[in-house]
Each structure stands twice: as C-alpha cells, then as structure tokens.
C-alpha cells in the first residue's frame, strides 16, 4: 500500500488542541513490573512533539495483553505504565481508571494546559475488539450499538487523533479505525515504520534480498508469493526449508518439520521464482537433534546424506551459512523475517547468529537492512544488534501483513493528504 499520501503528525497543527493518541503500550510484565520498556520509549517522540508544540492535552490509549473484554485490573492494568512514562517524560501523568464513559469524558474535557493523561486498558471493554469472552470464559460478540457508543466516547476525548500504534495497525479495532475526528494523523513511530517499508517495497535498492525463516510454509505462502514479485534473491531457511527440500530433492528429513499443506504449492512457488528470475538459496547442511529438546544429542547432516529416522534438523550447518553470507554480500537491501534455526537454544543458534553477524556487516557497508518484528526482533535484542541494523520493526504481525501486500486498516483509516 502506498503510505506516502497520509497525514502525519509533523503536518498536524496541535496548538491549543486536545490530542487523543493511540499508542502501543502492550509491554511485557512480570509481577506488575515492566520487563522491557522499548514500546513506551518508542512513543515518547510523538508525545513530546505535541507538548512542545502547545497541545492543550495528550490523552493516551492502549491495550495490554488479552483480557478479552473483561476488566482485569490486577493482571492487565496500564497503571504501571503511567509510572514508567512519568519518569521517561519527566512530568506528571494522570492515570484514569477507565477509557470511556462520563467520568473519563469529564476529566478530558478541559484539562490543565500541557496535561498528559493515560487511559486504562482499552480491551477491558469488549467493544474495542468487537468480540471477547464473558467472565465465565464463553465467547461473546459486542452489540453494534454499544460499539458505536464506545467509539463516540473515545472521539470526545480529543480534538485531533494521532495513531502511533504500528504494532496494532493490522487490526480493525475501535481505537484504530473508529475514532471520529476531522483530522487523523500517523505519529512518528508509525511514520518511521511505514517509510521504511514503503521505501523497501515501492522503490527498493537492488539487488534486493529477502531472508525468510520460521516454521511453516503455509503461514508464509502469501509472504513468499508477494516477495517473489519484488526481490532479486531469496533465502528460504528455518523449519520451512525441509518442506521445500523434501518436495524438490526428495531429501530424507527424519522427523523434521514437514508441512503437508505447504508442500502442495512448493513447485508453483519455485516456477514463479524461475519466471521472475529470483535466485533462491536453500540450506545444504544441518545441525540435527535426536529430540526437540534444548539438551538433545546433536549431529550433522547434509541434503545428500539426508537426516536419519528419528532425528530432526534444528539449525543450518556451516556450508549453508557460507551460502547465506554470499547472498548477503551481494545485496544492497535486505528484509529479514523469521530465524533460520531454533535460536532460543544455544546448540541450535549458530546459524541465525552467523547470519545476524553478516547482516550487521552488510549494514556497516551501507546496505539497507530491515528486520520484520516478532522472533527476528527478539534475535536482535538477544545479540544486542538493534542499533547495528537499519530498522527493527516494532510490529511482528503488522510488518508481516505489509510484506504480504495487504492493506493495514489502521493506516487506511488515517486522513489522506
């Protein structure tokens, strides 16, 4: 989708206005303590811009976890986020115990100039997602009239709307698409994400390499299919490589992942690659394990030797890493989505680590390197490479859907310019 024609915060006049801003404060928590504040830090530039440019108030709304429309303040309250945000901004943050209704509307109607207000978890109301569960765990759907009322209440909390929650941009939830204000702008985090992906997908530097890992082919079919129209080269690694190798080389894969559904379209994908002149690199050797366990016995295998019965491939081997490194060396732009081994376990992390080192090297020579969120972003955090690549996406699902060529509802809902 073209992202260049949407209103962004830098073009929005906020002076004297109440800004209602959707952010992504869905942070990991342990015993009500925030374990990683990256998402809160990522929203600070947009909040500060509004305050520095004379906004009357900034009202922040977010979800946290999956309470499914049931208020669970003990488990999923955003109150700890207000404390963290106060220390990051160096100013008071007023926390409200709900996100809609007369009391919230009153608190946000005429606040002191320069106020920052954080609302309670949007997903304590089933009207945010449109569906959820009741207190006994039965599935429930929100009533259309109540969804309308929920959206109308959110719309009363500001004069202008800013969406900086890229991580939720693929969800057509009330706070993402249902706030009815004349001006709806993308915040700076949203803008950074969309700019990177727009550049990557609409006018890429070439040669353009996609590195696609992860487990199931079926989950990545749309991704592979869409990227085959855009890239010059593609590495297909991780668990899904075994489905390709079994179909194409009749390789013995032991008990490695095999995706019956995905297997049916491997040949179609390969013929599309050939038609488009895309060079595909698959792994040629593997680190194997006698069971899916961190402390499993390990072995080696190649495509030619096959993987023995009862064993499975959990990482690529050194020859594969060499081939991957050659592809990285040729590239001027790289998009990476999905690890190439079970990186969480030391014995099977080497392939992904070696590839990360190559991608970092490529970045330092001027290659544009984009890490699609999720597991690959976790790899960056694990090996401390977040500032050694061009861009690490904050949205796993959202970045995946952009790379699949889908329209993101949260972006679509912003004002056109």
UniProtKB/Swiss-Prot annotation:
GO terms for cellular component: cytosol; extracellular space; membrane raft; mitochondrial matrix. Keywords: Acetylation, ATP-binding, Cytoplasm, Glycolysis, Hydroxylation, Kinase, Magnesium, Metal-binding, Mitochondrion, Nucleotide-binding, Phosphoprotein, Transferase. Gene3D superfamilies: Phosphoglycerate kinase, N-terminal domain. CDP binds at residues 214, 219, 238, 338, 340, 343. It comes from the Eukaryota. Pathway: Carbohydrate degradation; glycolysis; pyruvate from D-glyceraldehyde 3-phosphate: step 2/5. It catalyses: (2R)-3-phosphoglycerate + ATP = (2R)-3-phospho-glyceroyl phosphate + ADP; L-seryl-[protein] + ATP = O-phospho-L-seryl-[protein] + ADP + H(+). It holds the Pfam family PGK. Catalyzes one of the two ATP producing reactions in the glycolytic pathway via the reversible conversion of 1,3-diphosphoglycerate to 3-phosphoglycerate. Both L- and D- forms of purine and pyrimidine nucleotides can be used as substrates, but the activity is much lower on pyrimidines. In addition to its role as a glycolytic enzyme, it seems that PGK-1 acts as a polymerase alpha cofactor protein (primer recognition protein). This is Phosphoglycerate kinase 1.
């Amino acid at each position: 989708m073209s992202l260049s024609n949407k209103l962004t915060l830098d073009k929005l006049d906020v002076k004297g206005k109440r800004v209602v801003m959707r952010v992504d404060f869905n942070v990991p928590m342990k015993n009500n303590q925030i374990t990683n504040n990256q998402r809160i830090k990522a929203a600070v530039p947009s909040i500060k811009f509004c305050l520095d440019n004379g906004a009357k108030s900034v009202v922040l709304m977010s979800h946290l976890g999956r309470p499914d429309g049931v208020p669970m303040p003990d488990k999923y309250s955003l109150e700890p986020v207000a404390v963290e945000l106060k220390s990051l901004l160096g100013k008071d943050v007023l926390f409200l115990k709900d996100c809609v209704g007369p009391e919230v509307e009153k608190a946000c109607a005429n606040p002191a100039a320069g106020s920052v207000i954080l609302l309670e978890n949007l997903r304590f109301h089933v009207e945010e997602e449109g569906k959820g569960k009741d207190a006994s765990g039965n599935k429930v759907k929100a009533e259309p009239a109540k969804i309308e009322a929920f959206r109308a209440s959110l719309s009363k909390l500001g004069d202008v709307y800013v969406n900086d929650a890229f991580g939720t941009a693929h969800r057509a939830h009330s706070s993402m698409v249902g706030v009815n204000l004349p001006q709806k702008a993308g915040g700076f985090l949203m803008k950074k994400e969309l700019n990177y992906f727009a550049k990557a997908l609409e006018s890429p530097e070439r040669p353009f390499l996609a590195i696609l890992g992860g487990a199931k082919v079926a989950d990545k079919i749309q991704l592979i299919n869409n990227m085959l129209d855009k890239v010059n080269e593609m590495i297909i690694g991780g668990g899904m490589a075994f489905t390709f190798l079994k179909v194409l080389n009749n390789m013995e894969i032991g008990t490695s992942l095999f995706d019956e559904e995905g297997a049916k379209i491997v040949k179609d994908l390969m013929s599309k690659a050939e038609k488009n002149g895309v060079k595909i690199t698959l792994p040629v050797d593997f680190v194997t394990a006698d069971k899916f366990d961190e402390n499993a016995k390990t072995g080696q295998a190649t495509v030619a030797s096959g993987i023995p019965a009862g064993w499975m491939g959990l990482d690529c081997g050194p020859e594969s890493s060499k081939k991957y490194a050659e592809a990285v060396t040729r590239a001027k732009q790289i998009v990476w989505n999905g690890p190439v081994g079970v990186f969480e376990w030391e014995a099977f992390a080497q392939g992904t680590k070696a590839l990360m080192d190559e991608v970092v090297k490529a970045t330092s020579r001027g290659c544009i390197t984009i890490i699609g969120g999720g597991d690959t972003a976790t790899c960056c955090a694990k090996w401390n490479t977040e500032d050694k690549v061009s861009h690490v996406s904050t949205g796993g699902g959202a970045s995946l859907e952009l790379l699949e060529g889908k329209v993101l509802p949260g972006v679509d809902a912003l004002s056109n310019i």
